[in-house]
């Protein structure tokens, strides 16, 4: 599908309960380390932490397709319950998502 951008707007835990499974190499993984998920090899190549979101860059590879670079933008300021009180950060995050998605790439996965 030529997806180049994944957006995540939930945290892994909500009220200390698992809400989302981590589908990328862990934060304790050193950049450049690779983990296998089914047929896919995922290498974490870059992590940038900002006030209210994290940008992770991965190389995805399997034996049947060319390697691809995928960027994940993870909004980390969503409250456990309800919605953000101030939309400013969320709107800024949306702008960052749009800017991060390369031209002529496939759909953004949310």
Curated annotation (Swiss-Prot):
Family: Belongs to the protein-tyrosine phosphatase family.
Gene: STY-3
Catalysed reaction equations from the record: O-phospho-L-tyrosyl-[protein] + H2O = L-tyrosyl-[protein] + phosphate
PROSITE patterns to which the protein is assigned, alphabetical: TYR_PHOSPHATASE_PTP
Domain Tyrosine-protein phosphatase stretches: 1-110
Matching InterPro entries: Prot-tyrosine_phosphatase-like (IPR029021), Protein-Tyr_Phosphatase (IPR050348), PTP_cat (IPR000242)
Residues holding substrate: 80
Protein species of origin: Styela plicata
UniProt KW Hydrolase keyword: yes
Assigned EC number: 3.1.3.48
Name of the protein in its database record: Tyrosine-protein phosphatase 3
